[in-house]
Amino acid sequence: MAKLHDYYRDQVVNELKTKFNYASVMQVPRIEKITLNMGVGEALTDKKLLDNAVADLTAISGQKPLITKARKSVAGFKIRQGYPIGCKVTLRGERMWEFLERLITIAVPRIRDFRGLSAKSFDGRGNYSMGVREQIIFPEIDYDKVDRVRGLDITITTTAKSDEEGQALLAAFNFPFRK
């Protein structure tokens, strides 16, 4: 079992229960899922770019990504409905906890010119979204085998009712928020 999951159960739950005066431990916010999304608009011209993005996301998440397709045709972008334009992975359970641990301890500190994550990236319902400009911050990606530096979106979905609760939950995991 992931160390972060044990830490959540043993310490974070009690900490948040006293802070927000919850009646039951089931009211304490928890992380439901983590979604990784990589948009590859250039895949329209070169199909190999999408395959490389899928390989990168597989290495980062440990799970095979779902290829996302365009929902509708947009003439300005020269895409048609059904064209593959990206890939995404939804992590739950043990893989989610292991990824979160790697993200906090290894990947985020490797971001270039890192001064902390913005606390303004909450959506109003306690979910947190962040963008990563380079996939090479993850140790699973071999820098020499990267054909192109790609970014990805990371969304952490929680059961928190407000941004304050969501931020308290992530701060309890030592998320490096900007002061």
From Swiss-Prot:
Return the Gene3D superfamilies for the record.
Answer: 3.30.1440.10
Keywords recorded for this protein, A-Z: Ribonucleoprotein, Ribosomal protein, RNA-binding, rRNA-binding, tRNA-binding
Against SUPFAM superfamilies, the record matches this protein to: RL5-like
Q: Name one GO biological process term.
A: translation
| A GO MF label | structural constituent of ribosome
- On whether Cell membrane is a keyword of this UniProt record, the answer is no
Is S-adenosyl-L-methionine one of the keywords UniProt gives this record?
A: no
Q: What Gene Ontology cellular component terms go with this record? A: ribonucleoprotein complex; ribosome
- List the signal peptide residues: none
Q: Name one Pfam family in it.
A: Ribosomal_L5_C
> What is annotated about its quaternary structure and interactions?
Part of the 50S ribosomal subunit; part of the 5S rRNA/L5/L18/L25 subcomplex. Contacts the 5S rRNA and the P site tRNA. Forms a bridge to the 30S subunit in the 70S ribosome.
Q: Which family does it belong to?
A: Belongs to the universal ribosomal protein uL5 family.
Describe the function of this protein.
This is one of the proteins that bind and probably mediate the attachment of the 5S RNA into the large ribosomal subunit, where it forms part of the central protuberance. In the 70S ribosome it contacts protein S13 of the 30S subunit (bridge B1b), connecting the 2 subunits; this bridge is implicated in subunit movement. Contacts the P site tRNA; the 5S rRNA and some of its associated proteins might help stabilize positioning of ribosome-bound tRNAs.
Could you tell me what this protein is called? Large ribosomal subunit protein uL5
Gene field: rplE
